Amino acid sequence: GRGEYYWHRFFGHQPDLNFENPAVQDAMIGTLRFWLELGIDGFRLDAVPYLFEEEGTNCENLPRTHEYLKRVRKEIDQDFPDRVLLAEANQWPADVVEYFGQGDECHMAFHFPLMPRIFMSVRREQRYPISEILSQTPAIPDGCQWGIFLRNHDELTLEMVTDEERDYMYSEYAGDPRMKANIGIRRRLAPLLENSRDQMELFTALLLSLPGSPVLYYGDEIGMGDNIWLGDRDGVRTPMQWTPDRNAGFSNCDPGRLYLPVIMDPIYGYQGLNVESQMRTSTSLLHWTRRMIDTRKRHPTFGTGSFAELGASNPSILAFVREFGDDRVLCVNNLSRFPQPVELDLRRFEGVVPVEMLGGMHFPKVGALPYLLTLPGHGFYWFTLPAKRAEDV
């Protein structure tokens, strides 16, 4: 080379752009416009806290970064009002909330610390980790939303847990050293849950019902596996498994030219695990996930409603109510692998007949006494709580 240097914050092949330069700012907005004009729905703003640098700081969350985001948002709102900016900032919610601004920066932001605590709660069979992080999540401006997720294209990050919790997660979910990467676990959802259909359904039900917009990682809807023999994060980035045909239907190219090899192991191999086969099986995870998403879409409270956790008598049960006007939903989740009873204080809804959403079954009327439910291991209920009392129907 020429013996010259450039600044980079992450990999050596990722030079940092100089946002101090107005020409760089304009060029980036031009790049955004190029893709927006092609019809893209929005952008995930990767590592958004690090746009600007300033001597004497750690270069995170600087005021000029927020000023530039406001400019980007203003330009997008003017010409592309139906598009979304999703902030990716691997920080605590109290810091990330700044990227909403006053509703004039990003529309959405990922909620990172919730994800490992879902895994922790189910393995410990106690709701406390989920309850704690949700209670620490600040309010956000109207028109903004958290993006919640179970897995993504990186490792399951363990940056925002204690050392003790990190060791626990490694021991429970990363038995092989190859499963670890950076400060996290590089595994997909299905292998993390040992391919347990019950657990995958419970995790997905939590993803679709907790506060925020669900971000579903490709392949998790069919229970795709990973390849821990591939380097760094590539193990969870293998081609989508569409069919049992050449290259899993992802491409017709020579298999050696694929960006990564398709999964070919006995459990998650593409020949048996693919979209085509699951579309032909009415009981498949894919059909179940589509039904759950359809159910969610019929209840606006899941997207914009308030969230209130109920103090369930059983610590293995996570129960909460989502409300948006007359659209009221009760969600009850059993984090234990064993059947569990629970008594809920539903006196506020006395006289209401809960209706289970997926089957339409009417459950016993809510009275003044604690409301008793029993749930199978890793089971859950979604109930509507109709505004009309039973005697008014």
What are the residue ranges of the model-derived segments?
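Active-site and adjacent substrate-binding regions of carbohydrate-active enzymes
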Residues: 1-393
